[in-house]
């Protein structure tokens, strides 16, 4: 399958090549900057020490910034299951969007069409499992909110790009804001750790604060129309359904 890209290489990557089988993950990001040109400047500035493999513009054009077999600097401090520092074994895709700090907005249809095409190409090329297609906030719960609650995870999952639950929406919504017991809340967090979210709490952050961020990261991906940082029966049911899919 031919993939049409524009070349605009970033100097920010590790010099040592990796091998095909090291590439196990795709990580989605939004740029989180006021405009597209600023984002491109930052990703190609040697002093910024950040980059990605692919950049998707508002008009759907795909820019290749780092060759796949080199490690781009997009994930930062990160964790998923038993993997740390996911730069080593992932492909990073940045999608132009101002993000939560600059007027977060819906991704364009052209962006999503290109993302679909690019993801399918990478999945086939590197035999990447749907379970290993993640958002930046999945792997860096305390630091990141991207790609955020406007990112079309459910739509992408229908094309085997990422995982989504298989619960009936109407039935599920009836459980929204219904409180859980302490035991059920513990069960919810255990489900998240089984899915892959990190158990490790930074020394600088209280357990309560970390768990609140963790709930929000989960909601931004799987319960996108209400991010309140609270566990309810709806969240619990979704987590139970997902555990089966991630194992």
Residue ranges and their predicted role:
Residues 224-247:
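Extracellular LysM carbohydrate-binding repeats and other cell-envelope/extracellular binding modules
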Residues 202-212, 228-235:
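A glycine-rich, coil/turn loop motif that links secondary-structure elements
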Residues 99, 104-201, 213, 217-223:
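Basic/polar, cationic surfaces and motifs that engage anionic cell-wall
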Residues 2-131:
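Active-site-adjacent loop/helix surface patches within enzyme catalytic domains
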């Amino acid at each position: 399958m031919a993939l049409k890209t524009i070349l605009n290489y970033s100097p920010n990557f590790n010099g040592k090549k990796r091998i095909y089988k090291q590439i196990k993950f795709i990580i989605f990001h939004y740029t989180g900057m006021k405009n597209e040109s600023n984002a491109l400047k930052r990703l190609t500035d040697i002093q910024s020490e950040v980059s990605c493999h692919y950049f998707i513009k508002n008009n759907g054009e795909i820019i290749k910034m780092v060759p796949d077999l080199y490690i781009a600097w997009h994930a930062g401090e990160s964790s998923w299951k038993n993997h740390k520092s996911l730069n080593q074994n992932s492909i990073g895709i940045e999608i132009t969007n101002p993000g939560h700090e600059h007027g977060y907005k819906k991704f364009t249809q052209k962006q999503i069409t290109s993302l679909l095409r690019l993801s399918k190409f990478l999945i086939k090329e590197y035999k990447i499992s749907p379970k290993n297609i993640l958002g930046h906030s999945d792997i860096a719960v305390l630091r990141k909110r991207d790609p955020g609650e406007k990112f079309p995870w459910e739509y992408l999952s229908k094309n085997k790009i990422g995982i989504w639950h298989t619960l009936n929406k109407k039935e599920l919504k009836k459980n929204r804001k219904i409180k859980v017991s302490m035991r059920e809340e513990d069960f919810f967090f255990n489900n998240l750790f089984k899915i892959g979210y990190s158990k490790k709490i930074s020394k600088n952050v209280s357990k309560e604060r970390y768990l609140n961020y963790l709930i929000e990261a989960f909601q931004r991906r799987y319960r996108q129309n209400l991010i309140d940082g609270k566990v309810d029966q709806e969240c619990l049911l979704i987590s139970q359904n997902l555990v089966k899919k991630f194992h």
